[in-house]
Amino acid sequence: MKITWLGQAGLLFDNGKVKIMVDPYLSNSVEKVEPLNYRRVPVKEEFLSVSPDVMIFTHDHLDHYDPETAPIFLERKEKRMTVLSPSSVWQKARAFKAHNNVQFNRGTSWTEYGFRFTAVKAEHSDVHAIGVIIEDLMENKVYYITGDTLYNNRIFGDLPEKIDVIFLPINGVGNNMNETDAVRFFRACGARWAVPYHIGMFDGKTTDIFDDENKITLEIYKEREL
């Protein structure tokens, strides 16, 4: 699977046949509300032209369901996307009727294109926020995107025994884990590899603060095989 970090919590999964996009933030909309949270990373506009088969929004915050970025994808009608989002986002996304908008709350699974997607608990200020398990049924690989979350023991009951790669926030503000709790969470969930992210967009942090030998560091906009 080729994976590209789009900055903040944005991810693009591409196996050559199916494209899955998660939480794209490709604007500067947050700065308009919170001036200190301006982009430190420029938008790479080529990613606005990507045509995902599946779009996932984990919760209704500007840097995840972005009111400037999301409509660029949702207004297109040439291809019907599957859009997976919890109730807080689904209420907005379903206004774009060209796509299959699935209400994707905790405990819900959706199987399509050789993948199974399962919404799991996240502990965040948006009570509808979710994490997502992405199972590649052909390659027998499991990816876990925690979404924005704090360390909470109740999350672990939602998780599968096997996790190949976990993507988890380490910015430590806005009801997200800091690097210390993120390392604890990684080790507790039993994942093989950890990809720390949700940094560098509104701050000067790097993945160096995540101290574990099984860390994988992604560079923004650079594709990596995982």
Predicted regions located by residue number:
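Pre-active-site segment of Zn-dependent metallo-hydrolases
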Residues: 18-56, 60, 67-72, 149-161
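Active-site neighborhood of phospho(di)ester-bond hydrolases with catalytic His/Asp-centered motifs
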Residues: 22-23, 52-63, 83-87, 143-148, ...
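Binuclear metal-ion centers of metallo-dependent hydrolases, dominated by the metallo-beta-lactamase
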Residues: 82, 96-111, 154-162, 181-226
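Active-site environment of divalent metal-dependent phosphoester hydrolases
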Residues: 9, 28-29, 61-65, 90-93, ...
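Active-site HxH/HxHxD metal-binding segment of metal-dependent hydrolases
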Residues: 42-109
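Short active-site oxyanion
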Residues: 1-2, 77-83, 141-143, 193
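Active-site-proximal loop/helix segments of hydrolase catalytic cores
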Residues: 123-188, 204
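Conserved beta-strand hairpin/beta-sheet module of binuclear metal-dependent hydrolase folds
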Residues: 1-45, 128-147, 165
